[in-house]
């Protein structure tokens, strides 16, 4: 799950850069929403893994 959260976080960051750069100004609000959703999923995933006692896979 952490892998998916990181993947979608990267996709959201790329969409945000394109949206805020003027290339796709209509997608900026969608990129903001996606970014914060997957940022929250990343934090939740890190907390759950920490509580289970497992460290991140390297």
Swiss-Prot record:
InterPro entries in the record: DUF1328
Keyword list (alphabetical) reads: Cell membrane, Membrane, Transmembrane, Transmembrane helix
GO CC annotations, alphabetized: plasma membrane
Please list every transmembrane segment annotated in the UniProt record, as residue ranges: 4-24, 28-48
Which Pfam families does the record associate with it?
DUF1328 (PF07043)
Report which superkingdom the organism of origin falls in.
Answer: Bacteria
Give compartment(s).
Cell membrane
Its membrane topology, per UniProt?
Answer: Multi-pass membrane protein
Q: Which family does it belong to?
A: Belongs to the UPF0391 family.
From the Swiss-Prot or TrEMBL record, give the protein name. Answer: UPF0391 membrane protein ABO_0024
Where does this protein come from, organism-wise? Alcanivorax borkumensis (strain ATCC 700651 / DSM 11573 / NCIMB 13689 / SK2)
Source species taxonomy = Bacteria, Pseudomonadati, Pseudomonadota, Gammaproteobacteria, Oceanospirillales
């Amino acid at each position: 799950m952490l892998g998916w959260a990181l993947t979608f976080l990267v996709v959201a960051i790329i969409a945000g850069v394109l949206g805020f750069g003027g290339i796709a100004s209509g997608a900026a609000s969608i990129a903001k929403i996606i970014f914060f959703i997957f940022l929250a999923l990343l934090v939740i995933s890190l907390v759950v893994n920490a509580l289970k006692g497992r460290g991140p896979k390297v």
